[in-house]
């Protein structure tokens, strides 16, 4: 990694030395020749032969051979379920037999029925579908080899990123392809509504969980014991999504902790020696659900999963979606993560079968592990040329000359690589051809007309489609692809924003503003809790490396070359600042004292649409329900909005002075104070 001379005196804000920062944030360049296109062989070998191949996967050395029905029996007869049923019987005065019957019904609803025949069916069908719609499915072979070893040593938990319904099908397909055990997968109950398909998924390893348990202690006990039993037995790798649901905006969603808590428990209760956590990054050139996501972000309810809907979706088989990159990260030992941090002795004080309330220390540890896993996922997400192209287009909309687009995209390519972005760019093709092929792949969004690249703003002669403004649909699809870049740029961009918002150049003031921005946007982007100083140092280091700034003892100075870099970075992140300002203005205009979350979404959507229609704003990010939801969560956390529970629902009311102050701080009318992260 090159060290610019200006970075040598960077980091006197904290105790971390410059050398340590360089080591901390230098990212090993990934070698593309180590990636294998698994579809290459599929195109030359019969799909039927592939589906019917001899499948003898490597298994965990401590495996307890059992059938799916044996797991159910083991759960029902476990000490933990017996204990919980007895306790609930005392509390509710219901007979033990009734509660046991309920536990049986819960298990029947959730449990998988893993069968080799179903796996072979999916192998055959998915091979045909993937060859039809994807050019390549590229996998890092080294990651597969490490996973092969890990599966034999200890129970394994697979933690993939989640951008599409294809994610879990793709992983099962790949593990079957490499003769690894197909995972058991935590899936939402939505799929059970799909006739035949739901049962097929169950037979291919899916087990089903309700979105909310609603305080149902028996359901939680049965579900957690079911997952722990599979993990302890080494039955198969357990797979779930830390994000809990698909990200519609292509940004990583903040993690959910429930399942992570469950899979850690056998280790802390000394039921297994160790557990491997494997972060997996799945990247798409073009997302299958791109249009559906734009509709959902504009407030159109998600269509219910159904077999009919699946059959209607067959039209995607006539479209092309480019490449998929699947990066299997290094298996992370839970034992190593806990060493020196979390002792197992508290679990020795009571019998294993008695559920324990989670300690504050344990909650902090689980939270930290979840964020670390997500940061590993983010580090290995692959960028295609398209997010770079669309980022340039959005800052020059509605159209740009092709040569100007080419020049700006190549400049951004250099900056992305300098910032450690994991970028795939065909080096054997001229840059013009790379950009033209990207435009062709996304011809539903952009077109090349007479040497100008134009965003599509109309559908035929109409500006409306399904009651929505077509321009809004196009822009939200573009914003989702641009969002793929934000992971690479978030820290240097927030330093750039802080430099713009801070009067003067004092490093201490810039850091204070950076912390404020991290606090406000911690629902938008993934930051390791308590890591603000290191995040600031990384942002400064990358800006020094690109020669955009010089960090002196007390001040941060912008170089002559740095203006173009900072201008681009600010343009990338300013929409989030402006969106939150607009939502502050809506809250200050809110006439009702109290409102529900549903009312908030309806009213904020109406308010923002009017602003855009009137030309009072060009910030289309604010239309996204994802941004609106994250802003509300941030405002509650910062004390700008108060949240109360009334009759099983939450109501909100606005703290006007705090809202005014936040709006002024975001708009640079009021300097960010110290400490910046305190409640407003």
Curated annotation (Swiss-Prot):
CDD domains: LPLAT_DHAPAT-like (cd07993). The keyword Membrane applies. It is a peripheral membrane protein. One of its GO terms (molecular function) is glycerone-phosphate O-acyltransferase activity. GO terms for biological process: ether lipid biosynthetic process; glycerophospholipid metabolic process. Keywords: Acetylation, Acyltransferase, Membrane, Peroxisome, Phosphoprotein, Transferase. A motif (Microbody targeting signal) lies at residues 678-680. A motif (HXXXXD motif) lies at residues 162-167. Pathway: Membrane lipid metabolism; glycerophospholipid metabolism. The modification N6-acetyllysine is found at residue 643. Disulfide bonds: none annotated. It catalyses: dihydroxyacetone phosphate + an acyl-CoA = a 1-acylglycerone 3-phosphate + CoA; dihydroxyacetone phosphate + hexadecanoyl-CoA = 1-hexadecanoylglycerone 3-phosphate + CoA. The modification Phosphoserine is found at residues 12, 17. Its EC number is 2.3.1.42. It is found in: Peroxisome membrane. InterPro entries: DHAPAT, GPAT/DHAPAT, GPAT/DHAPAT_C, GPAT/DHAPAT_LPLAT, Plipid/glycerol_acylTrfase. GO terms for cellular component: peroxisomal membrane. Belongs to the GPAT/DAPAT family. Dihydroxyacetonephosphate acyltransferase catalyzing the first step in the biosynthesis of plasmalogens, a subset of phospholipids that differ from other glycerolipids by having an alkyl chain attached through a vinyl ether linkage at the sn-1 position of the glycerol backbone, and which unique physical properties have an impact on various aspects of cell signaling and membrane biology. Part of a heterotrimeric complex composed of GNPAT, AGPS and a modified form of GNPAT. The HXXXXD motif is essential for acyltransferase activity and may constitute the binding site for the phosphate moiety of the glycerol-3-phosphate. This is Dihydroxyacetone phosphate acyltransferase.
């Amino acid at each position: 990694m090159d060290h610019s001379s200006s970075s040598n005196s960077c980091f006197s804000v904290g105790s971390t030395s410059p050398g340590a920062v360089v080591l901390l944030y230098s990212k090993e360049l990934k070698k593309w020749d180590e990636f294998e296109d698994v579809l290459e062989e599929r195109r030359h070998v019969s799909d039927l032969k592939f589906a019917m191949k001899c499948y003898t996967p490597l298994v965990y050395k401590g495996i307890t051979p059992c059938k799916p029905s044996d797991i159910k029996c083991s759960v029902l007869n476990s000490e933990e379920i017996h204990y919980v049923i007895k306790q609930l019987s005392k509390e509710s005065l219901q007979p033990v037999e009734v509660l046991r019957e309920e536990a049986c019904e819960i298990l029947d609803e959730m449990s998988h029925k893993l069968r080799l025949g179903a796996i072979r069916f999916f192998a055959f069908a998915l091979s045909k579908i993937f060859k039809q719609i994807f050019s390549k499915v590229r996998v890092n072979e080294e990651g597969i080899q490490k996973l092969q070893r890990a599966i034999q040593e200890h129970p394994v938990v697979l933690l993939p990123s989640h951008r599409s319904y294809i994610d879990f099908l793709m992983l099962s397909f790949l593990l079957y392809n490499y003769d690894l055990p197909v995972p058991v997968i935590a899936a939402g109950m939505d799929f059970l509504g799909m006739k035949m398909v739901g049962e097929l998924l169950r037979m291919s390893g899916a087990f089903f969980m309700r979105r909310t348990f609603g305080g149902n202690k028996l359901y939680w006990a049965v579900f957690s014991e079911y997952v722990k039993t599979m993990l302890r037995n080494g039955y198969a790798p357990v797979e779930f999504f830390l994000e809990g649901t698909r990200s519609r905006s292509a940004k990583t969603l903040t993690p959910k902790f429930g399942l992570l808590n469950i899979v850690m428990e056998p280790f802390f209760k000394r039921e297994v020696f160790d557990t491997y956590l494997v972060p997996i990054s799945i990247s798409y050139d073009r997302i299958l659900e791109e249009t559906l996501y734009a509709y959902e972000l504009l407030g159109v309810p998600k269509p219910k999963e159904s077999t009919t809907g699946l059959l209607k979706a067959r039209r995607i088989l006539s479209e092309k979606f480019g490449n998929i990159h699947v990066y299997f990260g290094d298996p992370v030992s839970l034992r190593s993560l806990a060493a020196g941090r979390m002792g197992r002795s508290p679990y020795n004080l009571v019998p294993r079968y008695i559920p324990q309330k989670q300690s504050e220390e344990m909650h902090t540890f689980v939270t930290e592990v979840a964020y670390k896993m997500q940061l590993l996922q983010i580090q290995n997400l692959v960028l295609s040329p398209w997010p770079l192209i669309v980022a340039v287009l959005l800052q020059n909309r509605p159209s740009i000359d092709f040569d100007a687009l080419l020049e700006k995209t190549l400049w951004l390519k250099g900056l992305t690589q300098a910032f450690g972005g994991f970028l795939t760019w065909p080096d054997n093709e001229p840059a013009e051809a790379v950009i033209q092929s990207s435009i062709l792949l996304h011809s539903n969004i952009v077109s090349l007309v007479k040497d100008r690249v134009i965003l599509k703003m109309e559908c035929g002669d109409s500006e409306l489609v399904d009651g929505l403004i077509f321009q809004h649909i196009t822009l939200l699809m573009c914003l989702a692809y641009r969002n793929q870049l934000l992971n690479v740029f978030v820290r240097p961009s927030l330093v750039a924003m802080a430099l713009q918002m801070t009067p003067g150049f004092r490093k201490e003031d810039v850091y204070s503003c950076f912390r404020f921005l991290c606090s406000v946007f911690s629902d938008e982007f993934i930051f390791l809790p308590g890591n603000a100083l290191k995040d600031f140092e990384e942002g400064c280091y990358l800006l020094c490396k690109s020669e955009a700034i010089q960090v002196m003892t007390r001040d941060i100075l912008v170089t002559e070359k740095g203006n173009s870099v900072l201008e681009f970075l600010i343009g990338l992140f300013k929409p989030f600042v402006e969106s939150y300002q607009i939502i502050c203005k809506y809250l200050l205009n809110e006439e009702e004292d109290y409102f529900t979350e549903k009312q908030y979404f309806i009213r904020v959507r109406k308010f923002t649409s009017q602003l855009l229609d009137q030309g009072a704003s060009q910030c289309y990010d604010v239309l996204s329900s994802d941004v609106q939801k994250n802003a509300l969560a941030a405002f509650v956390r910062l004390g700008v909005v108060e949240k109360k529970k009334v009759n099983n629902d939450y109501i909100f009311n606005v703290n006007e002075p705090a809202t005014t102050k936040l709006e002024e701080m975001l708009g640079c009318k009021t300097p960010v104070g110290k400490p910046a992260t305190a409640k407003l």
